[in-house]
Curated annotation (Swiss-Prot):
Catalyzes the isomerization between 2-isopropylmalate and 3-isopropylmalate, via the formation of 2-isopropylmaleate. The gene is leuD2. Pfam families: Aconitase_C. PANTHER family: 3-ISOPROPYLMALATE DEHYDRATASE SMALL SUBUNIT 1, 3-ISOPROPYLMALATE DEHYDRATASE SMALL SUBUNIT 2-RELATED-RELATED. Heterodimer of LeuC and LeuD. One of its GO terms (biological process) is L-leucine biosynthetic process. This is 3-isopropylmalate dehydratase small subunit 2. Keywords: Amino-acid biosynthesis, Branched-chain amino acid biosynthesis, Leucine biosynthesis, Lyase. It comes from Thermotoga maritima (strain ATCC 43589 / DSM 3109 / JCM 10099 / NBRC 100826 / MSB8). Belongs to the LeuD family. LeuD type 2 subfamily. InterPro entries: Aconitase/3IPM_dehydase_swvl (IPR015928), AconitaseA/IPMdHydase_ssu_swvl (IPR000573), IPMI_Swivel (IPR033940), LeuD (IPR050075), LeuD/DmdB_bac (IPR011824), LeuD_type2/HacB/DmdB (IPR011827). Its EC number is 4.2.1.33. Pathway: Amino-acid biosynthesis; L-leucine biosynthesis; L-leucine from 3-methyl-2-oxobutanoate: step 2/4. It comes from the Bacteria.
Length: 166
């Protein structure tokens, strides 16, 4: 079960939209590994092709994932190896799409206290986010048991298939 997530922080600002996360010019494929190459391409060119993003955590400001409803956006983030997204707030459709594909996301009003390169730890079950670099701890609402099961299964579809198979 994905309970604790730890990784290097990459900071993005407010209103990061789905076109910045995965630009429309790359939507001619649904292959997650192809999408991963262009993750965050219009927000930070070349980000998806960096070697040091595997297992990292994106920390952003308000309204992350706004814009068009595009499941490709959280798929690109997850396929690039990003383990979690922390933001002050999320566009509701992005939030749901991320949960559906098994990408952990966390709303944290103090997200702007993180800096590029900090090491963060997220405990979904107990509702704690830590900035290990600065020695700070923040309380968040823990994931409910149902969402933890979706995360454990790897996404909504995988969860449903598991439930049907049992």
């Amino acid at each position: 079960m994905v309970v604790k997530i730890k990784g290097k922080v990459f900071v993005f600002g407010d209103n990061v939209n789905t076109d910045e996360i995965i630009p429309a010019r790359y939507l001619n494929t649904s292959d997650p590994q192809e999408l991963a190459k262009y993750c965050m391409e219009d927000a930070r060119p070349g980000f998806g092709r960096r070697d040091d993003i595997k297992g990292s955590i994106i920390v952003a400001g308000e309204n992350f994932g706004c814009g068009s409803s595009r499941e490709h956006a959280p798929v690109a983030i997850k396929a690039a190896g990003i383990s979690c997204v922390i933001a002050k707030s999320f566009a509701r459709i992005f939030f749901r799409n991320a949960i559906n594909i098994g990408l952990p996301i966390v709303e944290l009003k103090e997200a702007d206290e993180f800096e590029e390169g900090d090491i963060a730890e997220v405990d979904l079950e107990n509702g704690v986010v830590r900035n290990l670099t600065k020695g700070k701890e923040y309380r968040i609402r823990p994931y409910p048991e149902f969402l933890m099961k979706i995360m454990e299964a790897g996404g909504w579809l995988e969860y449903c298939l598991k439930e049907v198979g049992e």
